[in-house]
From Swiss-Prot:
Locations listed in the record: Secreted
Species classification: Eukaryota, Metazoa, Chordata, Craniata, Vertebrata
Enzyme class of the recorded protein, top EC level: transferase
Family in the record: Belongs to the glycosyltransferase group 1 family. Glycosyltransferase 4 subfamily.
Record protein name field: Glycosyltransferase 1 domain-containing protein 1
Primary location: secreted
One Pfam entry name: Glycos_transf_1
Amino acid sequence: MRLLFLAVLRPHTGNAVTAQRVRAHLEAAGHVCILKDAFDFESPSEIANLILAENCEAALALHLYRGGRLLQGHRIPFGVIFGGTDVNEDANQAEKNTVMGRVLEEARFAVAFTESMKEMAQVQWPHAKGKIYVQSQGIATTPNAAFNWNTFLQRSEINQSADNLHIFLLICGLRQVKDPLYLVDAFSEWHQEEPNVYLVILGPEVDPVFTREVKANVKRAAGVRLIGEMPQEDLHAVVKNCFAVVNSSVSEGMSAAILEAMDLEVPVLARNIPGNAAMVKHEVTGLLFSNPQEFVHLAKRLVSDPALEKEIVVNGKEYVRMYHSWQVERDTYQQLIRKLEGSTED
């Protein structure tokens, strides 16, 4: 089949990485997958022209509101994948909620990353009950073997001679829902006590206004650094070399950065929100914090307790192997896409 796949494709963001992985799964099954950025289209009529020009027989959208709404009414069957902010944020706005409900009426299937995301969607849109499937994200990490960690530290203006250096890495696009400033003050205070701990915030500048605020705050915070986005392989190499990966988001669908850290055998400290708590079991596969002070307390504990670190790393790696298999994800999407074969009247 010739498939149109609409997603939000800001480079090096979670949704873009997911979209590329799903496209690879579908192409491996022999489909032609035309991946387009939903933000490049203003109206369904532009999509109608694209469907005609590309001779698309079916479609898929990642993110119910940004992608899904553009696929309505074209008389080609489509499926949708929940992105995270669609269920966690957009569903709270009446107008967007109604639009997404209509998208779900027309979609042949919908994929949620977690059981809790599926349950939230079913509460919002009860009519979609029978068509929501759960498929967690499949994880495959590819760290760049040639990556130079010392050069990275130099670029980050981190004192490499600091004895027993501990780098905490927060990977996120600079936008409010990721709350990158949540830990900055508390971390900075800790750095002043212990100059060998650093927080590195790494990711693309998504929201320009908010980015300015982040830069201004980081500039005056001792022990906190801000680094722009980088290719996936280099990012995985940074993760592999850091002490721990941090997530401080206000809401999450399913953080690929957390799962990739687990796969690369690096401990995870995550804010205690539903999307994170679905993957991180406290003191088993990672550590969950509810405020900045608790984060610092847990981070200190992790630094001083190698046995805890080892246990978390072993359990995290096993969790990803068991529940985030790339092959299982491939099989699921290749099966679901068959629901789009046949006439629109099915």
